[in-house]
């Protein structure tokens, strides 16, 4: 059985991979970080199930500014509460974007996550994204 430190480290890895996959436009791979019946609840829509999550993420990318500026999602202030094979996670996030004037904060906010252990890995069961820093 993993230690609490190992579980928290694994959860940090999931959150980092989420950002990398989202930034790279690998939405099917991003959705794979959720449970089969996971929910992605954003300011722009809510989706349940991996296919629906990937579809929503893709549609949001297409809807945004074109050509799309290079963006990097950052997650910080991660607080994890473990309860056996479940975890509650709070974090802050920010999107940094390139612009002709230089780097800028595109948006930011907070995430509330419910995660579950799935075999030997952790998955997002529910991710609520609050967006309160807007351009």
Regions found by a protein language model. Name each.
Residues 5, 47, 102:
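Charge-dense, low-complexity intrinsically disordered segments
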Residues 63-135:
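A beta-strand edge to alpha-helix "cap/lid" segment located at domain peripheries
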Residues 27-93:
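A solvent-exposed, acidic/Ser-Thr-rich amphipathic alpha-helical stretch
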Residues 2-3, 15, 38, 65, ...:
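Residue-level detector of alpha-helix boundaries and kinks
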Residues 1-32:
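Short, low-complexity N-terminal intrinsically disordered segments enriched in polar/charged residues
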């Amino acid at each position: 059985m993993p230690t609490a430190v190992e579980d928290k480290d694994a959860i940090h890895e999931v959150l980092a991979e989420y950002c990398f996959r989202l930034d790279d436009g690998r939405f099917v791979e991003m959705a794979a970080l959720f449970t089969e019946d996971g929910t992605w609840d954003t300011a722009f829509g809510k989706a349940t199930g991996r296919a629906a999550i990937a579809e929503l993420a893709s549609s949001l990318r297409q809807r945004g500014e074109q050509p799309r500026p290079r963006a990097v999602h950052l997650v910080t202030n991660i607080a994890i509460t473990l309860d056996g094979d479940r975890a509650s996670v709070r974090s802050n996030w920010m999107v940094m974007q390139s612009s002709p004037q230089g780097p800028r904060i595109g948006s930011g906010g907070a995430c509330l996550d419910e995660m579950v252990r799935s075999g030997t890995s952790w998955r997002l069961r529910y991710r609520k994204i609050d967006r309160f820093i807007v351009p």
